[in-house]
């Protein structure tokens, strides 16, 4: 529920959690309620309540309480739920249950902020019950040990007048914060009315797009925008959404798949001339960690130690918000390190206060790392989501909910644990072996013949639950070891083991809910045997349920890309409500004569014919390169296919041939792009469709003159892809298209989009495969590539046609 203020009625409704959050800053593990959020902590909590329900007559749990009191000229209402309640003669006893690790925490609890927090919350509940029922009350703080299950009960003293005074003061502080925020919101609302578009003129199509985006925000719609590269989608979406967010007091999340796209949005935000709004760009925790080891606990990190006190005394968040309009991660890192506080936690606090949050998809859609505001439907209801390059979100969402247990990776963890000298090492090694046995038992169900196999297997939910419980007990002991002085090491194998299994277990309970509910048909449990080792995979064929839960909770969303066809595919697999979803398709704003598209239909790149046609494909690439005055990008469906064609390329006098490594580093990618830019002899760059040189990268000016796309780039046929095909056939009657053609042709169109980025760019796109002119592939070729029919793209000689195009355009 959080905080709700009605200025007209002079009422404020608040939850204990909101009051506590305003008074107690927490970090890392404790930010998420620590042990209480662990599976083992919840189990202990349930067990303690179960014992009380069984052993204490009339014991009640989760009873709602509501308490009204005056705060100046406001009526305040505190709403919450009691962990436990029972009657002892004439008095009412209220229980508050908290999970701890007795061996480490109990001795340090007395006088700690943690105990103050526990007791404060309980006293508020005591006051609420006393006022509501007019009876004597007593409070018990029930501490439960997550390792042994033991409990310790502490009586909590209760002075009604003192508690009411404390509660009143805390609400008064929250109201002051609210009034300050409200005044700032009024200033933002006023500025929004005149917030200028950051450029002198709209490009063709931009004004129409901006108007549709504004309408979607105003009406609460989901808007799927398919617009070609170069139209200026970034500012056409960002400006109207920012105006709406400032006008209505909403938060705007700008979500991208790559950091280069984030930089583009930040530059656009900087160009928008406004003083009242604040934006922050988030960076991954590992890259924002100032400690030598990523371990977010005050006992192991000086930047986490005394975090609350240092933040309070430094006023860092307020100072950053007062002095910077956009909060860059580099600046946040340096300022936080100077105050010796955790830079990542500071960025999270800034994100809570900022009007615009720019970051990776993970911060809203990944169930493990998403921001707290993205997990709360009420908070999402006051948020706008802008999803850039939204064609990537289906696969990314599928990845969030397709965890796997890999024997090869588990074996590596076991080796690292073997060299780790903490007391918990033996237990950790045994835990890894148990998880490996889980994978081995699943793989044993596969047919014995052959080095490779994959099939559906059953999942033992009880076995997974037991493993989760024991792994969390191990985690508790391991953290105690570290606290006692055990060596901390980078990439802690015990933490890696726990979080790997925890994600798998969480998704398993989603796929096969406890309590006898029907398994979700969108998920499969797959055992895989391969030369690299066995794997147990939870395959999310359709991520629409979890993604839709987030997107549909938002006030409005815009999903944009150069490739969102067919729109019903993205609507359905993103889980967007049909009655809220609109589609906007915009044509290219650039002259059609600036680009030529040719199809070389005399080759067949299907798997069966691929080897036969490799020599002809090499000739096609060479012909285009010879006819082209500038750099050429040739894209292949795989590195193996690329190398087969490369081996058959004839000599190309005066042209450099580059083939980046399969897993090129950022430094190598930057160097390669620099070579394209250096003005020397032209380059033939060989890369793969869907890779770093095919998507999310710009080739401005004359960096690129032609793109050759070899094959429709369909996903590889394998067991998992075939399971998706069967699922899509059953649900949509479009199995092959949804599992293979749409992903492949999306890559093709994305690759071609690298070529024309402005009205002065010219170039040639060559599609090498006869399938491009056959159904269903031809259906996914953009309409602005041809006049009346895709057959117009057929070329008898792509080399001659390419040379003729550049002769005509004067390049």
Region roles according to the model:
Residues 601-612, 662-773:
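Conserved RecA-like P-loop NTPase helicase motor core
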Residues 69-164, 766-768, 772-773:
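Nucleic-acid nuclease catalytic cores
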Residues 237, 243, 263, 267, ...:
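Signature of the SF2 helicase/ATPase Hel1-core->accessory helical subdomain module
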Residues 1-91:
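Metal-dependent nuclease catalytic cores that hydrolyze phosphodiester bonds in DNA/RNA
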Residues 185-192, 196, 246-357, 362-365, ...:
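A substrate-engagement module of RecA-like helicase motors
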Residues 332-352, 357, 368-375, 478-604, ...:
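A contiguous, basic/glycine-rich beta-loop/short-helix subdomain that forms a polymer-engagement track
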Residues 218-240:
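Walker A/P-loop
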Residues 184-226:
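Conserved pre-motif I regulatory segment
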């Amino acid at each position: 529920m959080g905080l709700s203020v009605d200025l007209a009625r002079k009422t404020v409704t608040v939850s204990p959690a909101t009051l506590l959050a305003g008074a107690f800053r927490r970090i890392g593990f404790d930010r998420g309620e620590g042990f209480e959020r662990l599976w083992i902590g919840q189990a202990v909590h349930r067990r303690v309540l179960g014992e009380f329900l069984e052993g204490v007559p009339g014991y009640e749990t989760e009873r709602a309480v509501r308490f009204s009191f005056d705060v100046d000229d406001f009526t305040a209402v505190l709403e919450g739920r009691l962990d436990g309640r029972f009657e002892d003669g004439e008095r009412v006893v209220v229980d508050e249950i908290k999970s701890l690790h007795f061996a480490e925490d109990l001795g340090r609890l007395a006088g700690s902020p943690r105990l103050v927090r526990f007791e404060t919350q309980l006293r508020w509940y005591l006051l609420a019950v006393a006022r509501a029922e007019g009876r004597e009350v007593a409070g018990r703080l029930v501490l439960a040990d997550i390792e042994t299950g033991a409990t310790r009960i502490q009586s909590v003293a209760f002075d009604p007048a003192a508690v009411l005074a404390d509660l009143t003061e805390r609400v008064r502080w929250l109201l002051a914060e609210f009034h300050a925020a409200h005044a700032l919101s009024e200033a933002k609302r006023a500025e929004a009315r005149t917030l200028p578009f950051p450029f002198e003129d709209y490009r063709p199509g931009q004004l129409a797009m901006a108007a549709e985006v504004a309408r979607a925000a105003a009406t609460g719609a989901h808007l799927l925008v398919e617009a070609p590269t170069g139209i200026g989608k970034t500012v056409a979406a960002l400006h109207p959404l920012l105006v709406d967010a400032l006008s209505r007091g909403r938060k705007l999340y700008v979500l991208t798949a790559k950091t280069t796209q984030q930089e583009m949005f930040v530059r656009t935000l900087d160009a928008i001339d406004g003083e009242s709004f604040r934006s922050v760009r988030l960076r991954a925790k590992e890259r924002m960690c100032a400690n030598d080891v990523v371990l977010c606990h005050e006992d192991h990190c000086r930047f986490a130690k005394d975090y609350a006190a240092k933040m309070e005394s430094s006023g860092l968040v307020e100072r950053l918000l007062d002095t910077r309009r956009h909060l860059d991660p580099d600046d946040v890192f340096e300022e936080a390190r100077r105050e010796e506080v955790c830079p990542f936690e500071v960025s999270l606090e800034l994100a809570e206060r900022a009007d615009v949050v720019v970051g990776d998809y993970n911060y809203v859609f990944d169930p493990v790392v998403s921001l707290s505001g993205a997990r709360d439907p009420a908070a999402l209801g006051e948020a706008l989501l802008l999803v850039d390059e939204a064609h990537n979100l289906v696969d990314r969402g599928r990845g969030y909910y397709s965890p796997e247990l890999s024997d090869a990776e588990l074996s590596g963890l076991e080796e690292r644990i073997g060299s780790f000298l903490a007391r918990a090492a033996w237990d950790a090694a045994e835990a890894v072996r148990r998880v490996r046995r889980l994978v081995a038992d699943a793989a044993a169900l596969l047919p014995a013949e052959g080095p490779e196999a994959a099939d559906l297997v059953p999942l033992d939910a009880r076995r997974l639950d037991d493993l989760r419980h024991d792994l969390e007990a191990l985690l508790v002991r391991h953290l105690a070891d570290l606290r006692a002085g055990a060596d901390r090491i980078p990439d802690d194998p015990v933490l890696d083991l726990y979080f790997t299994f925890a994600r798998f277990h969480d998704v398993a309970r989603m796929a096969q809910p406890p309590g006898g509910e029907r398994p979700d048909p969108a998920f499969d449990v797959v055992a895989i045997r391969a030369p690299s080792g066995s794997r147990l995979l939870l395959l999310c064929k359709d991520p629409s349920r979890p993604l839709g839960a987030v997107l549909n909770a938002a006030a409005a969303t815009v999903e944009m890309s150069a490739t969102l066809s067919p729109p019903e595919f993205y609507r359905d697999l993103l889980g967007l409500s049909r009655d809220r979803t609109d589609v906007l398709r915009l044509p290219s704003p650039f002259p059609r004569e600036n680009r030529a598209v040719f199809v070389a239909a005399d080759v067949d790149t299907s798997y069966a014919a691929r080897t036969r046609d490799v020599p002809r494909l090499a000739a096609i690439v060479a012909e285009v390169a010879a006819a082209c005055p500038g750099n050429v990008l040739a894209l292949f469906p795989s590195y193996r296919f690329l190398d087969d064609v490369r081996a058959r390329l004839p000599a190309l006098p005066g042209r450099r041939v580059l083939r980046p490594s399969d897993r090129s580093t950022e430094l190598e990618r930057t160097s390669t792009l620099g070579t394209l830019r250096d003005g020397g002899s032209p380059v033939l760059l060989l890369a793969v469709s869907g890779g770093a040189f095919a998507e999310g990268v710009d080739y401005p000016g004359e960096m690129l003159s032609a793109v050759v796309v070899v094959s429709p780039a369909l996903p590889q046929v394998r067991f998992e892809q075939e399971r998706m095909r069967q699922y899509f056939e059953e649900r949509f009657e479009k199995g092959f298209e949804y599992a293979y053609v749409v992903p492949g042709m999306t890559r093709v169109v994305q690759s071609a989009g690298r070529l024309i980025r402005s009205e002065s760019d010219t170039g040639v796109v060559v599609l090498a495969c006869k399938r491009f002119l056959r159904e269903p592939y031809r259906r996914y070729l953009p309409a602005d590539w041809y006049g009346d029919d895709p057959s117009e793209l057929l070329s008898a000689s792509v080399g001659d046609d390419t040379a003729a195009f550049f002769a005509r355009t004067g390049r």
